[in-house]
């Protein structure tokens, strides 16, 4: 997928040894729905910012019928999908106070382990890595931090019926020429129970 020209509204982050003014895209968040039974589902993303792309088209939310295997049928156009896609500008300050510095050549193995621990299944993990690995594997190092409430509070999900399990993986990362010291991030394992919703996406800082 070609990169869209998208920017964050201006904000400042203290990063490494200086202050960096950044305006960067939130890329390829995709949402998967796994109800226990075939279920009509309403999905809204309440964004502190603005959308730059959605697929299928976002009409004040998505109204769909979801199957247990993850297949999604749109009630707007009767087409079927395997996920809901959005991309946009989110007004928040990513947190790099903890994270990981990973050699480019070791990024694939790192992501496989980290994403599995964070709760992604094989297909979700593979799609995440297929999208991001080409941008990361040739860097000397990658600084990686998975965002938590500082992201989800600015891009809340409103889903009806309410899911039993919600897994949201947002990776903020930056290519590095040299390794730096950083406090390791604690990754919490998530167990899937009942109606499960999964979202993943990422942000690169250059």
Model-derived regions, located:
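Hydrophobic alpha-helical segments, principally membrane-spanning helices and signal/leader peptides
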Residues: 2-3, 106
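Sec-dependent signal peptide recognition
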Residues: 3-10
């Amino acid at each position: 997928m070609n990169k869209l020209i998208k920017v964050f509204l201006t904000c400042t982050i203290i990063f490494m040894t200086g202050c960096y003014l950044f305006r960067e895209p939130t890329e390829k968040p995709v949402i998967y729905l796994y109800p226990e039974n075939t279920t009509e589902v309403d999905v809204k993303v309440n964004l502190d910012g603005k959308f730059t792309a959605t697929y299928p088209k976002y009409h004040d939310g998505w109204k769909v019928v979801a199957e247990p295997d993850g297949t999604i049928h749109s009630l707007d156009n009767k087409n079927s999908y395997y996920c809901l896609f959005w991309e946009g500008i989110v007004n928040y300050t990513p947190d790099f106070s903890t994270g990981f510095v990973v050699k480019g050549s070791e990024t694939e193995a790192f992501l496989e382990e980290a994403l599995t621990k964070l709760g992604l299944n094989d297909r979700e993990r593979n799609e995440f890595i297929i999208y991001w690995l080409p941008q990361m594997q040739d860097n000397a190092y990658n600084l990686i931090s998975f965002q938590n409430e500082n992201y989800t509070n600015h891009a809340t999900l409103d889903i009806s019926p309410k899911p039993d399990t919600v897994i949201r993986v947002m990776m903020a990362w930056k290519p590095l020429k040299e390794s730096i010291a950083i406090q390791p991030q604690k990754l919490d394992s998530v167990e899937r129970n009942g109606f499960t919703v999964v979202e993943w996406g990422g942000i690169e800082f250059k």
